[in-house]
Each structure stands twice: as structure tokens, then as C-alpha cells.
């Protein structure tokens, strides 16, 4: 079975580049792992229903799974303290 292709928008790639080196390595390794098993994370709830999270130290990768296209769309990468509030605010504004 072929893996899933990661889809990383430019703003998320910029956020990854700005992370500390150890976290950046962890995020890159996590994206590779998620490409092989996108269900390895945990599903989110409420406003973020349909998205998943994956933990890398104090940071979170938030992503969606498109099983038909076999892609994982990385929605955001950030510190756990702020990432969910930012995404929930974005979801409410839609």
C-alpha cells in the first residue's frame, strides 16, 4: 500500500522553518511518519472536528486526511498553548 503525500502550504512551511532546530527535526520526522500512517495522531473535536493532531514535544501538528486523494494537509504547526485557540478562531470566522 502506497503512503500518503503531505500537502504543506507556504505559511505552514514558513512556520516550520522558524522552529528551533530540535523541534524542526521532530516535525519533519513526524510528517514522514504520518505519510505512512495518517491515523497515528488523535482526532480533534468541536470547532476542529475533522482535523487531527500529532504531538512533537510541546508543539502540535494539526492536519486533515484526504483518503480519496491519499494526502495529508498540514493545517498548522505551533506551540500547544496557542495552536488550538488560533485554529478555533479561524474556524469561527468562516
Where are these regions (language model features)?
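N-terminal first-folded block
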Residues: 3-43
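Short amphipathic alpha-helical "recognition" segments used for binding
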Residues: 26-28, 32, 51, 57, ...
Amino acid at each position: 500500500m502506497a503512503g500518503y503525500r503531505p500537502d504543506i502550504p507556504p505559511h505552514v512551511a514558513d512556520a516550520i522553518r522558524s522552529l528551533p532546530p530540535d523541534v524542526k527535526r521532530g516535525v519533519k520526522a513526524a510528517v514522514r511518519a504520518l505519510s505512512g500512517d495518517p491515523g497515528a495522531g488523535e482526532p480533534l473535536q468541536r470547532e476542529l472536528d475533522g482535523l487531527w493532531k500529532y504531538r512533537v514535544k510541546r508543539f502540535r501538528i494539526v492536519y486533515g486526511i484526504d483518503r480519496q486523494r491519499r494526502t495529508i494537509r498540514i493545517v498548522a504547526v505551533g506551540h500547544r498553548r496557542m495552536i488550538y485557540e488560533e485554529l478555533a478562531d479561524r474556524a469561527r470566522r468562516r
